[in-house]
Design a protein with these regions (language model features):
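Phosphate/dinucleotide-binding and metal-coordinating scaffold of catalytic cores
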Residues: 1-162, 166-169, 178-197
Length: 197
């Protein structure tokens, strides 16, 4: 099944994707928010937080950018096959530069927070993005008035680790692993997986 989907993406027509004309730059990959790599990521946010658009700085290397886009789309298909939640993703274009749109998974009354912010909520200052750290945070959150299903929380983190191993993802860190915080119930859960390339 995945090979059939891979063939579908091999002949992708990016021009048929969305045209994003109301976006604003929210983050560039690399240290201090500025791209330091030859092929850094550039993130844009659609109005009202509906989605984010990710592209790359490699404007003269279309094949590399297209392969990264295809990788992101294939990872979404893999997530679906192995039962890991992943937001809707589709190819898009902004000012003639191709990328992918990842739609917001937070519903009304929910906030999307990254692992770094989650560590701060749990008053955990020595966060190192390890499995043990997430188990510790799941134990600590109720102390600060948050609800968490520890078993599901830790299980979801393990699934992500296994998925990243299978897909050779070496860039999963505290700023691209997300959690959903329900503002009324104060429940925290692992968010669908984004930024898989």
């Amino acid at each position: 099944a995945i090979l059939k989907n891979t063939e579908k993406y091999a002949n992708i027509k990016l021009a048929k994707g969305l045209l994003l004309d109301e976006t604003k730059t929210v983050r560039r990959g690399g240290e201090s928010g500025v791209s330091t790599k030859k092929y850094g990521k550039v993130w844009f946010c659609l109005p009202k937080g509906r989605a984010i658009f990710k592209t790359y700085d490699d404007i003269f290397c279309f094949d590399i950018r297209q392969n990264r886009i295809i990788n992101e789309l294939i990872c979404k298909e893999l997530c679906n096959l192995v039962g890991i939640r992943c937001p809707e993703i589709e190819p898009a274009s902004k000012n003639g530069v191709e990328g992918v749109v990842s739609y917001n998974v937070a519903k009304s009354g929910e906030e999307l927070i990254n692992a770094m912010k989650l560590g701060k909520i749990a008053h955990f200052n020595d966060f190192s993005n390890s499995l043990e750290d997430y188990a510790y945070i799941a134990d600590e959150l109720p102390i600060y008035g948050y609800n968490v299903d520890k078993r599901k929380f830790v299980e979801d983190i393990y699934k992500i680790c296994i998925f990243d191993f299978i897909t050779m993802q070496t860039d999963r860190h505290e700023c691209n692993l997300f959690f959903i915080k329900n503002k009324s119930t104060r429940e925290i859960s692992v968010a669908p997986l984004i930024d898989n390339e």
